[in-house]
């Protein structure tokens, strides 16, 4: 939403503003670009999040829930909710959607709470991967605690959106020559009077910078840095696959968040340092317009990074399109039959290889007229003297937890 700073006093009636500050060429170009980008995000990201969310819900219903899949489902839900209210905000910013005060406040609550929970969920996913790898023994977190964390996250998101709802209202815009305020258009905006700029507005911008910008970057970088260092100690095959995934995930997030945090910090500075003149008010609107696009871009790339990059999730999506995930019993029966067939083929292949090896060994023994003893070679770190060595404990636990982390990061 646009943020309007008006050099007047606050009253209970809808404010009327005569736009004496003409829109500059750069501001018009940036606002037009914002509208085009938001339209693209709505028409591409909306269906994409809907498909991913439906696939994840059906997969959870068929295969069961886990802590990562619960977080993934919440992430797709918040992104879809944000993109659901975004068209109304875009139309309002373009002066194409008249609305009342109550509907504007409702849209503000949904928008700011869903964006807040979306950023928090991304940080929670990173924290959960750190928890899995950091613990010596992998202990699954109970579903009750997971749901409690998400409940508290949504509660915090709603509390965070309260200031936005309080200061969201309908503003009637009029031309500078319309002294009687007869012709105009209404928009949903965050409305602040001049005396609230250095107190309420500054506090809101600083809070937004911390919650939407700095905190997710710090948590993602910290937790995935530990994840990255742990992956390097595993086997080469597991390392190359997971390192690529984590690198793409982290680089994409930081590439979007770094300019966003910089813009928000500069916007907070401009709020307090710049005077209330047309030139500076226009620059503030330009900076705010640039910063507004970043949360919407996250809603577009999150399903791509967390779902579509995973081979397992793509397989589930194909099964969803074929209708295989609609019947849980039929799907589980089909999976069981496939596993049984695979095990039968594997056993048959092993038996054939064993017979061939036995015949070849007997032939060599017959030709060489020599007896060969059978030795049982234990791999390093196996049972010795009735006890298992520590090297096996280290070599099995970390790859096992890493495998769980990689599949859980893929959203399945």
From Swiss-Prot:
Main location group: virion
Ranges where the record places region Disordered: 377-412
Localization of this protein: Virion; Host cell membrane; Host cytoplasm
MF term (GO), any: G protein-coupled receptor activity
Entry protein name: G-protein coupled receptor homolog UL33
Residues that span the membrane, as ranges: 30-54, 71-95, 103-129, 139-160, 204-224, 241-267, 282-305
Residues with attached carbohydrate: 7, 18, 22, 177, 180
Disulfide bonds: 104-188
Ranges of compositional bias, category Polar residues: 388-397
Gene3D superfamilies (UniProt xref): Rhodopsin 7-helix transmembrane proteins
Keywords carried by this UniProt record: Disulfide bond, G-protein coupled receptor, Glycoprotein, Host cell membrane, Host cytoplasm, Host membrane, Host-virus interaction, Inhibition of host chemokines by virus, Membrane, Receptor, Transducer, Transmembrane, Transmembrane helix, Viral immunoevasion, Virion
Annotated InterPro entries: CCR1-9-like (IPR050119), GPCR_Rhodpsn (IPR000276), GPCR_Rhodpsn_7TM (IPR017452)
Assembly and binders: Heterodimerizes with US28.
Family under the similarity heading: Belongs to the G-protein coupled receptor 1 family.
Cited function: G-protein-coupled receptor (vGPCR) that constitutively activates multiple oncogenic signaling pathways including STAT3, AP-1, phospholipase C, NF-kappa-B or cAMP-responsive element (CRE) pathways. Plays an important role in viral reactivation from latency through activation of host CREB1, facilitating its recruitment to the viral major immediate early (MIE) genes. In turn, expression of the MIE-driven genes such as UL123 are de-repressed. Also facilitates virus dissemination via the extracellular and cell-to-cell route.
